[in-house]
From Swiss-Prot:
This protein's name: Peptidase T
Source organism (scientific name): Streptococcus gordonii (strain Challis / ATCC 35105 / BCRC 15272 / CH1 / DL1 / V288)
A GO cellular-component term linked to this record: cytosol
Entry note: cofactor: Binds 2 Zn(2+) ions per subunit.
Pfam families to which the protein is assigned, alphabetical: M20_dimer, Peptidase_M20
Residues binding Zn(2+) 2, per UniProt: 142, 177, 381
EC number from the UniProt entry: 3.4.11.4
Class of this enzyme: hydrolase
Gene3D superfamilies per UniProt: 3.30.70.360, Zn peptidases
């Protein structure tokens, strides 16, 4: 095995519960992420050869591998996140399936199975080593595979000084899954020309386009009277919420869109006749389309208020992150390098938009162009999550190839 510590490192990481908490007011949102960084990652970062290793109050563990050849002038960063998604992460018991035979994989004693009939991606991995869940938790390959791959690449480079490279910065951060991890990223002191998040999915993913994203919070104010005498008096706040929703295009919902299509997504609807609340997320790739979606919601609210004779529909819009393509397309060097390295490794680059966001979305707008590399995970965020060890090894190869790349 080229990277003998990769599997054990990954298994150690995923057994630690680092689930983030969107209701928390602290950064990191959970103490477990802080403990994971200080008790496991920081000591290991030092062991694998990183220097100037420290932990910031913003939740990031940072380290540097100095250049070993002055002809490599580019300084490159690699970033992954510690937290896992909103699914049970307590007592993760990963299964290691060696030489996968292409059949159904029972997930422990849970009664759940990984079945190629349900998950066609499994067909790609026959003969490989797969790491799965036991059916009671997620796995945490998103994004502990990325952390393990970066750590393993640094370990390998430290042990092989004949591989020449420039300065490398590493950052492991919190709370990506709840969308706030990069808000306090110290870009000024993460001194690199560009970086990569190692937070993608299957082999070959190379992404530099994300959604632009906003959140919409709506309050609907009704007027409650006895339903027996309600004619021309009652204003049902729940009905206002329904009326608002029905004025949004039915085709512009997540379950009906793909590729570069944007959407409105109703996340939550609660209330009574007197008052109701609705939460939406708004997503699109193009700036004009993104702005038009927000304007359309405001126009619906304004129209309803005009018809109601007073402000009963209160809309608050808040931008969350923007399509990092706006930054990265100004200098495609990180994409050209990653693509060239993958091709040299016989990896077919898969350059597609991310129908979501990464920490790189925000970090790019802080002045560090940060596209996304594959980390290997499949079926992320749930009990059917799995990852191929061979794909993780290829991610390590890619990281090493990027830092040692020079134009011929």
């Amino acid at each position: 095995m080229k990277y003998p510590n990769l599997l054990e490192r990954f298994l150690t990481y995923v057994k630690v519960n680092t689930r983030s908490d969107e209701t928390s007011t602290t950064t990191p949102s959970t103490q477990s992420q802080m403990d994971f960084a200080n008790n496991i990652l920081i000591p290991e970062m030092k062991r694998v050869g990183l220097e100037n290793v420290y932990y910031l109050p913003n939740g990031f563990a940072i380290g540097t591998l100095p250049a070993n050849d002055p002809s490599f002038t580019l300084k490159i960063g690699f970033i992954s996140h510690m937290d896992t998604a909103d699914f049970n992460a307590e007592n993760v018991q990963p299964q290691v399936i060696e030489n996968y035979d292409g059949g159904v994989i029972p997930l422990g004693q849970s009664g759940f199975n990984l079945d190629p009939a349900d998950f066609a991606s499994l067909h790609k991995y026959k003969g490989q080593t797969l790491i799965t869940t036991d059916g009671t938790t997620l796995l945490g390959a998103d994004d502990k595979s990325g952390i393990a791959e970066i750590m393993t690449a640094i370990e390998y480079l430290s042990a092989h000084p004949e591989i020449k490279h420039g300065e490398i910065r590493v950052g492991f951060g919190p709370d990506e899954e709840i969308g706030i991890g990069a808000d306090k990223f110290d870009a000024e002191n993460f001194d690199v020309d560009f970086a990569y998040t190692v937070d993608g999915g299957p082999l070959g993913e190379l992404q530099y386009e994300t959604f632009s994203a906003a959140g919409a919070e709506l309050t609907f104010q009704g007027r409650n009277v006895h339903p027996g005498t309600a004619k021309d008096q009652m204003i049902n706040a729940l009905q206002l919420a329904i009326d608002f929703h029905n004025q949004l295009p039915e085709a512009d919902r997540p379950e009906k869109t793909e590729g570069y299509q944007g959407f409105y997504h109703l996340m939550n609807l609660t209330g009574t006749v007197e008052e109701a609340q609705a939460s939406y997320i708004i997503r699109d790739f193009e700036t004009d389309a993104f702005e038009n979606r927000k304007a359309a919601m405001q126009a619906i609210a304004d129209k309803m208020n005009q018809e109601l004779g007073r402000e009963r529909v209160i809309l608050t819009l808040k931008d969350q992150y923007y399509n990092m393509k706006q930054v990265i397309e100004k200098d495609m060097t990180p994409i050209h390098i990653a693509k060239a390295v993958m091709e040299s490794l016989d990896i077919q680059p898969i350059i597609e938009p991310i129908r979501g966001g990464t920490d790189g979305s925000k970090i790019s707008f802080m002045g560090i162009p940060t596209p996304n590399l594959f980390a290997g995970g499949e079926n992320m965020h749930g009990r059917f999550e799995y990852v191929s060890l061979e794909t993780m090894e290829r991610a390590v190869d890619t990281i090493i190839g990027i830092v040692s790349y020079q134009e011929k």
